[in-house]
Amino acid sequence: MDSERDVRAQLQRAGQDHLLRFYADLAPEARAALLAELASLEADALREHCQRAAAAGALAPGPLPDLAARLQPLPPERVGSAIRCDQETRLRWEEEGFRQISLNKVAVLLLAGGQGTRLGVTYPKGMYQVGLPSQKTLYQLQAERIRRVQQLADQRQGTHCTVPWYIMTSEFTLGPTIKFFKEHDFFHLDPTNVVLFEQRMLPAVTFEGKAILERKDKVAMAPDGNGGLYCALADHQILEDMKQRGVEFVHVYCVDNILVRLADPVFIGFCVLQGADCGAKVVEKAYPEEPVGVVCQVDGVPQVVEYSEISPEIAGQLGADGGLLYNAGNICNHFFTRGFLDVVTREFEPLLRLHVAMKKVPYVDEEGNLVKPLRPNGIKMEKFVFDVFQFAKNFVAFEVCREEEFSPLKNDDTADRDNPSTCRRALLAQHYRWALQAGARFLDVHGVQLTEQSGMLPNGDPPAICEISPLVSYSGEGLEMYLQGRQLQSPFILDEDQARLLRPQDC
């Protein structure tokens, strides 16, 4: 272990020796832990990180200069659509996706390094329940979608396939996530096919360029953003693991989208048939000022431009069809070939831009007292997963229906949008639509049949509560055999047990 003298000299070179100012107050165990943490922060890298953070924090936020002359929508030939395509084309994409899944060439990779702080909880977001009748968590919904898509591929191709699930966690979420999965028997997935790994952490920095102590014996650290994926892949030999399994295509997504379709065969098939090395699902922006990044081209290169970087004038520009010109909203749902990820980790990762996040970072003051600031006092530097789009040789975007595939969980219920209630309603509304399309009808509390025209209730809930397990249907398929011609009382849960009861005897 590095000595106090060595660590202090290292910190002095970095201009960060204040991190040891409470060393004399600490017990032996706390001293050892602090020295170990500080020794891992290499002096030159620490100095550069703190200087870059302070410099970036001093820049005025706002629209990028000269963006109007540099910005273009993606060329039409680079964009596919699950909404506007004909049925034959969609089936061709889906069939190719299922073929690749059946050949064990597809993996999913979950970005799960963030805590549920904005939700008012201290545990990982994936462990959160939004209040579904089944009380399923985000992790369970996602695990069951993996099981179902494997089952569908096997049924179509006559195989026994595996979709490995890679989960990138952080120092905050790794332990709780492992414990949660073990407690729930990995949701009946083979544990050898669930690979958890940890992203790097970076010190939070004051506006003056000083690393922050959150306790006398602990530096305030934060995950290096979802773009930390590329270092983490290299740190933990994840690409080597994928190669050994025969994985060629990776579906990367964020933990907080309750409607996410893991290993979506339509998306996978589209990207593969296009020969893409990198792809992004997008949804049409709801309105010009919607706070989502835009997938577009800057100087002829594909990338995501954050909503804060686009002026209102550009955001409101209309295209020839009368819709928004820059309407491809990014939803953190991406396709990569393993070969592309390998090149990124070896060559391009150091070129990724660092993004600034101003945060309220708890700290200890000069007397060693804990302070919880009421306004941002620190800078956390992050990399974004989508900043590799610029390095793709064949980038594509794939438009999907927001109501079917995107409802993120960002805030608690005091917020107007992206909260547990909006997520719950989005999923239940989807399942209600699926049930109607399968030929079911619902009864209200008085036993009166609801009409198909029955609108959403004043609170945003569907007219009847219906939840369909991902183990029964992945995207609305196969429900007719259970629901055709049936009258259902709300609330109705179609899980595997209920499906067995409703299944016709001759099936």
Swiss-Prot record:
List of residues binding substrate: N226, K410
Coiled-coil region list: none
Molecular function per GO: uridylyltransferase activity
Classification via InterPro entries: Nucleotide-diphossugar_trans (IPR029044), UDP-sugar_pyrophosphorylase (IPR039741), UDPGP_fam (IPR002618)
EC identifiers of the protein: 2.7.7.-
Binding site for UTP: L111, A112, G113, G114, K125, Q199, G225, D256, K380
Cross-referenced Pfam families: UDPGP
Superkingdom, natural source: Eukaryota
Chain location of the short sequence motif Substrate binding per the record: 111-114, 306-307
UniProt keyword list: Nucleotidyltransferase, Transferase
Keyword Cytoplasm belongs to the record: no
Family that this chain belongs to: Belongs to the UDPGP type 1 family.
Protein known as: UDP-N-acetylhexosamine pyrophosphorylase-like protein 1
Originating organism: Mus musculus
Name of the encoding gene: Uap1l1
